Regions:
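Contiguous, small/hydrophobic- and glycine-enriched helical/loop subdomains that border
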Residues: 81-119
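Acidic, Ser/Thr-rich low-complexity intrinsically disordered segments
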Residues: 220-261
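A generic structural motif
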Residues: 88-92, 182-187, 270-273
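Short beta-strand elements
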Residues: 132-133, 146-148, 246, 253-271
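N-terminal lobe of the biotin/lipoate ligase/transferase fold
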Residues: 1-93
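Short, glycine/charge-rich beta-strand/loop segments that flank catalytic centers
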Residues: 36-41, 114-125
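Long, positively charged amphipathic alpha-helical accessory segments at protein N-termini or as interdomain linkers
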Residues: 102, 110, 129, 137-237, ...
Length: 318
């Protein structure tokens, strides 16, 4: 069955909780979840909040910081942005089909949208949608933003990605590479885009979508509290002795290492890689081994992107 879930809530922690709840309860169905957050920077599962966002400025101006389950980079949400999430069993997960829904919704408002790179949708050569992905225990979701009429000044002020990441994309600022769809379709609103997304969802999947009732707030409260907690948002800082970082085609990586008696005692990994499991895999591979280049290289070679990681570590001459 196809379902559309909608909410008028604009609290990022409650909305992320609902997203997780839907994933846990999607069953054999495919759900399109449409939602909006008010004045929020949402960072990827493994990102460093202080490196990606001007957190103090965001807080001073009444904004919220949120961290999602999926990997990828930081994005700004306001009520000029429309979020979407496709949720289903792995056997029903079809990225091209899901992207086709977004492209069809854009076509309905006269915009030609194309997929670019690892996770972006472009219109007029500029990004209007960043996408990210999460897979767990046979279920998956694909979610993203749709910039309709977002406050670009705030977007540019709050987001502060590493300089190397921007240089790798050939741009000088976050703002210079994004576009509001309203600029290309002046009568477009978030309300209209929700209608277009629903119509496109039904057209691409070839069946009528039913409206899915949203659970009571009390059911979502424990998950919402997790997403709002300082532990989830910021983690526990470690007294690191060594910082290693590099920019790859698959994302930016920063590794903080705490060494005690010549042995790696703790590791913190920050990355915007789309593979949300990479950070924990890398951390697990490094903790407990001698702090020597050859040992580190040996430990990472079997991991995803192992050769890239090995080359980064060899270059450190530890």
């Amino acid at each position: 069955m196809l379902y559309v879930a909608k909410t008028d809530c604009t609290d990022p922690y409650k909305n992320l909780a609902l997203e997780e709840y839907l994933l846990l309860n999607v069953g054999d169905n495919v759900i399109l979840y449409l939602w909006q957050n008010k004045h929020t920077v949402v960072i990827g599962r493994n990102q460093n909040p202080w490196a990606e966002c001007r957190t103090s400025l965001l807080e001073e101006e009444g904004g919220h910081l949120a961290r999602r389950l999926s990997g990828g980079g930081a994005v700004y949400h306001d009520l000029g942005n429309q979020n979407f999430t496709f949720l289903c069993k792995d056997e029903h997960y079809d990225l091209q089909k899901q992207l086709s829904v977004i492209q069809e919704a854009c076509r309905l408002c006269g915009i030609d949208a194309t997929f670019s790179g690892r996770n972006d949708l472009l219109a007029d050569g500029r990004k209007f949608s960043g996408n990210a992905f999460y897979h767990s225990k046979g279920f998956s979701y694909h979610h993203g933003t749709l910039l309709i009429d977002t406050d670009m000044d705030r977007l540019g002020r709050y987001l502060s990605p590493p300089k190397a990441k921007l240089e790798s994309k050939g741009v000088t600022s976050v703002r210079s590479r994004v576009v509001n769809l309203k600029e290309l379709s002046p009568t477009l609103t978030c309300a209209k885009m929700k209608e277009y997304m629903t119509r496109a969802f039904e057209a691409v999947y070839g069946q009528k979508a039913l409206l899915l009732p949203v659970p009571e707030e009390a059911i979502l409260l424990p998950m919402a509290e997790k997403y709002a907690s300082a532990d989830w948002l910021y983690g526990r800082p470690i007294p690191f002795n060594c910082t290693i970082q590099s920019q790859f085609t698959w994302g930016h990586l920063q590794v903080l290492i705490e060494v005690n008696g010549g042995v790696i005692e703790n590791v913190q990994v920050y990355t915007d890689a789309m593979d949300f499991a990479l950070a924990e895999q890398l951390r697990g591979a490094l903790i407990g081994i001698p702090f020597r280049s050859e040992e580190l290289v040996r430990a990472v070679q079997a991991l995803p992107y192992g050769e890239d990681l090995a080359q980064m570590l060899r270059a450190q001459e530890l």
